[in-house]
Amino acid sequence: MLKDNQKHNESVAPNSAFLSELQRALPEFFTADRYNEQGELIAKGGFDLARFERALKARNIDELTSGYQIDFIGKDYAKKQAGEKSVTVIVPDVEHNTLAENKNSHNLFLTGDNLDVLRHLQNNYADTVDMIYIDPPYNTGSDGFVYPDHFEYSDRALQDMFGLNDTELARLKSIQGKSTHSAWLSFMYPRLFLARKLLKDTGFIFISIDDNEYANLKLMMDEIFGEGGFVTNVMWKRKKEISNDSDNVSIQGEYILVYAKTGQGALRLEPLSKEYIQKSYKEPTEQFPEGKWRPVPLTVSKGLSGGGYTYKITTPNGTVHERLWAYPEASYQKLVADNLVYFGKDNGGIPQRVMYAHHSKGQPTTNYWDNVASNKEGKKEILDLFGDNVFDTPKPTALLKKIIKLAIDKDGVVLDFFAGSGTTAHAVMALNEEDGGQRTFILCTIDQALSNNTIAKKAGYNTIDEISRERITRVAAKIRANNPATNSDLGFKHYRFATPTQQTLDDLDSFDIATGHFINTSGQLAAFTESGFTDMINPFSARGLGVPGGASGEETLLTTWLVADGYKMDIDVQTVDFSGYCARYVDNTRLYLIDERWGTEQTRDLLNHIGTHQLPVQTIVIYGYSFDLESIRELEIGLKQLDQKVNLVKRY
């Protein structure tokens, strides 16, 4: 599969990801692929622009002849990245995931480059995430951000891909290792493009940012999410005190940009604030003792659509009012019976409905948050958990709680692919404990090494992701200590996204699918000369990839394949024995054969299981490196003789 992904990436153009999105939304305007008699692809289908223009004209839809878009050095390369597939593998942290508190958890912590992680998640989490929150690098010049891509293609390949001359190539490569605006935009573009595809149609994304890149981010988000996707720009007061951090203005706030994937979602109402209740509601009275209340007009204007109801109302003091009322007469009488009508101080005024504060559905949020929490609270939370300031700029959980409650219900999925100190996970777990919710989180951060002079390094942490995971563990322990009977999901599954060694990639490249042999550069049969392993499974073990966690090569390959095939990380995997060979079975339909030692006896046993309906199977996926050609042919012939269709997929 890695070879397939590498080959796919070579053909990806800057517009490939866009065309894929367009085809999903408007398949009727794409021509079909064309194949020859041997079933080989000879011409790939494409977008039929003429047909699309005819459809627009037929529906009297005017084209926009002008518009504005953001442009920057590296944009075409960033677009190409958005369409590429990952060439990393997913390594389960078996030692962690099998612990009692984690084995049944639906929370995920993903360690790796978030671009690779987002590419993988396209397969199994597209259109399923309820909200995304990210706190990316602000590109302040002192936050450590530099463009990380090393341009895996040669100069000639880059020139051919994007039609660059020597000067343009030099400009593109100038962003490498830099912190320019173009470098930051090139870094963020593919990540935000892929993130949008993960959201449900009702989903929202919240992005923390400051003045350094706000203007550029707004334009880029307008391009990726559409101008109509813009919801608001929140100003969050992150610092309460005035400081001398500038000669001109003391910076106290930063922004939270909010976008919706489509117009189908709506932010939740917030509970009425104490200040609003104090200002707008009356104190309880003998007549209305249930709590603070306010009178609301029962009349409607004649101009309102939907009309109203005309009838006479006689007040307690005998005054008669005839108006256009908002409620039918029977509904009004019900309000009177429930003591929810106010007739004024003299009991003769125009009747008004009594609304109690505790009956209110809430109020919309504002775009200025000056009383949520500050960065000081975020730092104090870290200090309380760790006993030291192991993270410099953590967001406070109160801020994330507010965002989460605005965006999703109690059972939503929250994604944060710049996880940092793990505040998002902390907020999710705390909210679930407070209101009995079943929200789940997906966190991702890179295993960036910590500098030797940092407090975290001196405290024993080696990488940023270790701090994030330790915070989740400590928060969970604190919740359990406060409530031993809690039913909240306080664990998480951990996976690392790793790149195979160059030696392993060289071995993969040397395999000749047609003959089933490894061929050296001289065209001669070769053993595994590069990776040092005697098979093509163990190089993908945790040991072979140089990461902890104890995963076998089979577990890594299976996890990677399951994600590629659209299965969630928590899919139940069963083991089926075929004459001593352990196969993996999922979804009551799909069988994975990864290990070596498959032969005639196993094929016979498998065909018997399927043919006698002991095991329903629709698809069998085999690891081509573990099978000789004769075993594959024998399996293909046997499957064709069954009275049901079973697909055989060979992966390399």
Curated annotation (Swiss-Prot):
The keyword S-adenosyl-L-methionine applies. Residues 135-138 are annotated as: Binding of S-adenosyl methionine. PROSITE patterns: N6_MTASE. One of its GO terms (cellular component) is cytoplasm. It catalyses: a 2'-deoxyadenosine in DNA + S-adenosyl-L-methionine = an N(6)-methyl-2'-deoxyadenosine in DNA + S-adenosyl-L-homocysteine + H(+). The keyword Methyltransferase applies. Coiled coil: none annotated. GO terms for biological process: DNA restriction-modification system; methylation. GO terms for molecular function: DNA binding; methyltransferase activity; N-methyltransferase activity; site-specific DNA-methyltransferase (adenine-specific) activity. Keywords: DNA-binding, Methyltransferase, Restriction system, S-adenosyl-L-methionine, Transferase. Its EC number is 2.1.1.72. InterPro entries: DNA_methylase_N4/N6 (IPR002941), DNA_methylase_N6_adenine_CS (IPR002052), N4/N6-MTase_EcoPI_Mod-like (IPR002295), SAM-dependent_MTases_sf (IPR029063), T3RM_EcoP15I_C (IPR041405). DNA restriction requires both the Res and Mod subunits. Homodimer, also forms a functional restriction-competent complex with Res. Belongs to the N(4)/N(6)-methyltransferase family. This is Type III restriction-modification enzyme StyLTI Mod subunit.
